[in-house]
Amino acid sequence: MHEWTQKRAIGHFHPLRPAIKTIVIHQSSVCARSVLQHERDAIVRVTLSSICTSDLHIKHGSVPRAVPGITVGHEMVGVVEEVGSAITSVKPGDRVAVNVETFCGSCFFCQHGWVNNCTDPNGGWALGCRIDGGQAEYVRVPYADQGLDKIPDSVTDEQALFVGDVLATGYWAAQISEIKEDDTVLIIGAGPTGLCTLQCVRLLHPKRIIVCDIDEARLDFVRLHYPEVLTTTPDCLTDFVLANSDHGGADVVLEVAGSKTTFRMAWECARPNAIVTVVALYNGPQSLPLPDMYGKNLIFKTGGVDGCNCAETLKLIEEGKIDTTPLITHTYALKDIEEAYRVFETRLDGVIKIAIKSAE
């Protein structure tokens, strides 16, 4: 079992900082300030980061590709400190959002926008999983010409914090779901990813949006911030969807909860020939009861986020069309991140998302 703790790093000290603080899953690791390793790298001084449910999956050993001893964290914004010789898209001093995906931009999959499947050895989800991530004071970003986006001057760090991961996931999910204006869209799960997905679905103006969650506090959040959205709980879901759809079920279902029962719930509430987009990351296998599903002719879409639209979402934030700041319910200093993890994992005090300030 890996030990989950906070460590002070040794070596490669920043002249103004006697130690570099990170949060790691470690066995006998030593953390140091990030240094350039490639001409397309950049070093970012992290100003604000966040804890993602995926970090909890790593903590509990549910992500086999995660490297023991890695500094976790893949939701972050910061300031460019140093760039490799091939980087011209950003420069030291630029405020940037960091993409959860590492991608080369030139392989077959990147050229088609499927950056999660980048064929580079470091491609896909690397930061905070296979290489050191951003719950730290500094992070090295490979392929920084692809993975960093400048934050507009009028956009705060808090507004941009989720651009590289959870908001990118919601935007990607909404885009691939082929939502039309006459559609009834069902979103299962009102956690952080579900709420970001909801914001991006709203941009497409479907006829109805239904959000289902087991947590009344999260449904209250939806009712407060998005009063036009219909809400329900799992025990009422089937009848509620039938009463609020035109063709015997939802036209599009986005499964963002990832529990033992929500996958079945998703396809059962879909009308025949509907699209079911599986956004959630499951801890275990799911049953695919093909005899029960036969005849519904459903289209399933699933997989890791192709997060290559961060510049677009930053523009939407700048224009006031997306605002994820209400999701930040708690803020902690990096030195207090163990407490932040405790609050986030046990869902205390109405927590939705936590912002971690690296600077003291």
Placement of each model-derived feature along the sequence:
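Glycine-rich phosphate-binding loop and adjacent beta-alpha segment
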Residues: P206, L224, S259-K321, A355-E360
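Glycine-rich beta-strand-centered segment in the early N-terminal region that forms part
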Residues: R17, S34-S49, S62-Q111, P152-V155
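NAD(P)H dinucleotide-binding glycine-rich loop of Rossmann-like/cofactor-binding domains
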Residues: S106-I188
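A short acidic, Gly/Pro-enriched loop at the edge of an enzyme's catalytic core
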Residues: V241-V253
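Mid-domain Rossmann-like dinucleotide-binding core that forms the NAD(H)/NADP(H) cofactor-binding site
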Residues: K150-D239
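Local beta-strand N-terminus motif with an aromatic residue
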Residues: G93, D182, E228, G249-A250
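C-terminal hydrophobic helical "lid"/dimerization subdomain
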Residues: W4, H14-R17, T22-V24, R264-E268, ...
